[in-house]
Amino acid sequence: MAMKLLFADNWHFHRRNFLPIFEALKKDSLPHQFETSRRSWWKAHGRYEHLSKSLKKSIEFIDQHDDLRAIHCLDVNLWEISKAEFLCSALTQNHWHVGGIPNESDSVFEFAMANPQDKEALRLCLAAAHNWLLFWNQYLDGHVDISHAIVFSGSYIYTRSLMALAKQRDISVLVAEHFFTGNDFYLEYRDGPIANNCGVKRDFSFHSCIKENEAKVTASAYAHSRMKGMKNRNVPQKNISFKNPWGDKNPIILIIGQVANDFSIIETPSDEVSSIASYKQGIIELLKNTKANVIFKAHPWERRRAPLFRPLTKIKIDEFIQSLPEKDQARIALIENESIQSIFLICDGVMGISSQGLLEACYYGFKPVLIGDTFFSNKGFTQSANQNPNLLNKSFDKKMWKLSLKEYELFQDFMESMFTEALIPNSKFASGLICEKLLDSHAKPSAKHLLGTIRTPKMKWTDLLGDVYERPHAWMRLSGIWIKSKLKSSKPSK
């Protein structure tokens, strides 16, 4: 069967977001098409009231069933492909953040059904799922030459329904998602969402292709340049430094907040569906068991994230702080737009759920404490308070919150493998990786064979000294690798 690509939308897929994909389409004249007829449906984000007339027949279908959780269409369970987008809307509402709601399918469903407003929203999401399945089924019937479907994220109803039907028809599905650097992205063959579940979580081994030699130095420099060049498109770049309000010598812990309805939280089973409830518990544990002061950094993207459009996490954490005794209030700083790099320079530890900002914390030498699970858990450079109760006590050993050189080496190896094996740089020169991936479903989108052509950005000596001061772990690591490679090459051959 000849190759023909179907892009699920042109909302996410355009040249600015995925330049090498479009270069590959142009360079190799790859047959492709975009579904463009349902823009208002793509952007519903779990709110389908404005489409109720278009959904009339699907709503009637839903109303014929008593158990909304068990409805199927074309052998696809509607609740399974609707849950994530339903929560994308539900988690913008206050009553979902009271705490005690596990992020587990049955618990979420039962909580939604107990509230009339949520029940109606769920009913419409199920109707949308039914409608999308019928739409895609008819679309694919009319385009039997489609060999590959390419979707963004995989958590929206319109993408989940397409993925389910593509699986039935043996159509290969590639899921794309941005990495936190803003300059790299994932592109993986999969039949489920990619949020907080990229391939390296399931299929990863250290030193898989790069050995302790000059190539290792090049890979390290490449990973370093990608991290230094990061520009998270969801975080406004503001040069605002945090001013330390505490005059004591108590340790400072940074909690990195995420967008309340972020799919990386929604798609990860946990004890709490509400990130806000998890943050509150983390703050309570720090106040109760340590002398640490706490900086909570809310995510500025909440003001622009649909359908939230307000700083919900910041509002709820502020309300929580105001409910505490004054002596505890004085130990907490709530911020939003301040540079996270300026906070890394003064804090003694970092906590978070699954934010990829925790990887940036590792880059600065911290060993983050995870409140939840993430694709980089259990790799040797993060930790859990549940697994290490000595983390939270009055004596507070700062060394436990920092990476040892061996742990930093594991982080460096992980990031090298991420950038050279799992991620595609959003650059023209990476178009060949796209073609390689399309032609071989077992191939990893690997930049390793391009390492010889990579040139890291030039740095002024003042920039270099500043970076050594900020991140001594990284430079000790790179120096060690370079020295090893030189010693190895200087040994006489036998």
Model-inferred region functions:
Residues 2-12, 35-39, 150, 258:
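Nucleotide-activated donor-dependent transferases that construct or modify glycoconjugates
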Residues 4, 22-130, 178-231, 452, ...:
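Conserved N-terminal ligand/cofactor-binding loop architecture of enzyme catalytic domains
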Residues 158, 335-382:
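A donor-sugar binding/catalytic signature common to diverse glycosyltransferases
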Residues 313-335:
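Nucleotide-activated donor-binding/catalytic signature segment of Leloir-type glycosyltransferases, i.e.
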